[in-house]
Amino acid sequence: MAAVEFQNVGISFGEVSVVRDLSLTVADGEFVVLVGPSGCGKSTILRSIAGLAAISAGDMRIGGTRMNDADPATRDIAMVFQSYALFPHMTVAQNLGFGLKIRGEAKATIAAKVAEAAATVGLSDHLHKRPGALSGGQRQRVALARAILRRPGVFLFDEPLSNLDAEFRTAMRAEIVRFHRSQGASMVYVTHDQTEAMTMGDRIAVLAPLAAGHKANLMQYGTPDEVYNRPANLFVARFIGTPRMNVVTLPVEGGAIRFGSQSIILPPAGACLAKVTLGQRPEHLQLAPERSDTGLTGSVEHIENLGHEMILTLATELGPLVLRQARSGKVPALGQSVRLTLDPDQVHLFDVSSEQRIE
């Protein structure tokens, strides 16, 4: 397996800059997810690893070797696409063995390798079938097995689960993670789905579009826990997490901000500012007990009952706030006046101007 390194990489198409000043390393054997909204450059970055998108600036290395101008065939990579790219007139076994046949390997060798790859992804009983007789999840497993047969240094996944329904996506997420653990392979995985990013990656690269005014694409690179619990900036705070983080801008008075009747003492980096942006995850807001005068007053505007939990949208003097909590006890009614309290240990603070995290 091989590490992948980006050093100040830029990618442009004509006068349009799509990726700017990208520096990150995918360690040997690591599973890294590139996640972000449309236009953030995630698929372009993946294509640059494969040699399908030209690098305009900086260096990209695979296994320590500079690959900017290397032919795609020499890069020792395998790619799994959103579309399965299977030959419809061939059986699963023929689809899997096609590349080996083109390379001139012996029939017995091809049969043995195909059987091994099919067993790895649970397709041993489907080798005689054509793609039209398979489910979406099974077709994606064929594509994965075909990548396995290349024995690459790096696996690339370009939104491979986007065409699957929710049940198959959940199952395939687990299968790909199990495959990574069993192979110890270096993997780079592109998705717009933060659930996939949070549940699959050893590390996550959160990317933003340059067209939105960002100076560079990479907003944060870290473990799922780091990205969720310590977002580096307001973009990451808003992008990662469902429902989205509550964000309000508050004046600083005497080194503190007020959330209704609650006072939150700021660290020195925030206490000297005129105002700060406060972020609070919906699960870290709580409904105060009845007749309590603590916190912020709000009115229940909307209730989503998910069975095991509730998501409440509340109208407050600070604007709409969303609360997420396990369903227990009495559920407030629409229009009911309630009080919200926040957990001061779970507060996120951001500079209003730079939108960077305040520690």
Named regions from a protein language model:
Residues M1-N163:
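ABC family nucleotide-binding domain
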Residues H308-L312:
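Short aromatic-glycine-enriched beta-strand elements
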Residues R181, S186, H192-Q262:
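Internal alpha/beta loop-helix hairpins
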Residues T170-Q183:
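Helical segment within the ABC ATPase nucleotide-binding domain
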Residues F259-Q262, L314-P320:
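OB-fold (S1/OB) nucleic-acid-binding surfaces
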Residues V32, N68, F87, S124, ...:
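Nucleotide phosphate-binding site architecture
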Residues T249, G254-E304, G329-E359:
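Glycine/charge-rich catalytic "coupling/switch" loops of P-loop NTPases
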Residues A166-F168:
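Helix N-cap at the start of a conserved alpha-helix in ABC-type nucleotide-binding domains
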